Amino acid sequence: GTMCIGVAATGVEGLKAIIPEAGISNWYDYYRSGGLNVPALQWQGDDLDILAKYCFSRAKDADDYKTVEEGYKAAHAKLVEGEDRDSGNYSRFWDERNYLNQIDNFKAAVFIIHGINDWNVKTNQCLPLFKALEKKGLDRKILLHQGEHIYVYDLENSGTLGMVDRWLDHYLKGEDNVVETEPKVLVESNIDQSKWFASDTWPPEGWAYEEFPVDADSDRLTLRDDLSATVYDKAKDNQKEWLDELVLSGSEDYINRIKFVWDPFDTATT
């Protein structure tokens, strides 16, 4: 998913269409959030330099690696320095790795496929890209399903493969199949996964964001990050019990959490 976004950001000639699945559009927002190090779910400690090391396949061939080892180590050291894990700040290093800055170079039609429950590449990657494409007026489409990371095929009542085929037939083969007139936004219901909501804009027409004030009284709220105040037991690794206590307990005495409670919604939220 990410590679085709990066290629499209170069403005290379001949690239007519891309279909990023769970693609990254801004590397800072993948590894950071407001100055904090925020790795993907189940990838604690991950960062750009570790990903680069993981992807450097030439290291698997000892003889080949010797010919590039010096250059690789120098480039890798620059990654470690540039990512600045100690501060977590947005910098020129990260700005250069923000493909949204190159949106004016995009020429290809973009069909984004992304899982709403993807906690590896989150939706803060696909939605800003779609909005940027929308603002530029480029041919675009986004399919938001209820799956996780890169789970796209055989989605009930989605016709995903048919849409992909029509997209490629139109933009690569020039077939007049009116795919560009189909809804630009498809969102799978989180209640009935056989139903899909269609719209031509994001947010979808008729939808609105709900704001939740977290400090309505302007009082400063604090918590103490201390596992000893919970039921968590490192020896047992009882994460479920810890989560149940954190979320479900009605007690307000826990010093290790801040809990915001609103009245029930009057209408459905999907």
What is each of the regions a protein language model found here?
Residues G1-G6, N120:
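Glycine-rich nucleophile elbow surrounding the catalytic serine of serine-hydrolase chemistry
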Residues G6-N105, D176:
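Accessory cap/linker subdomain of secreted extracellular hydrolases
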Residues V12-A17, K107-V110, K136-K141:
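Loop/turn elements at helix/coil->beta-strand transitions in domains of secreted/extracellular proteins
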Residues A74-K107, N238-T270:
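Alpha/beta-hydrolase fold catalytic core
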Residues F106, I112-H114, D118:
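Short beta-strand/loop motif that positions the catalytic acidic residue
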Residues W119-L127:
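Conserved alpha/beta-hydrolase "acid-adjacent" motif
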Residues L133-I150:
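Catalytic histidine neighborhood in serine/cysteine hydrolases
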Residues L155-T270:
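C-terminal, loop-rich substrate-recognition/catalytic regions characterized by aromatic stacking residues
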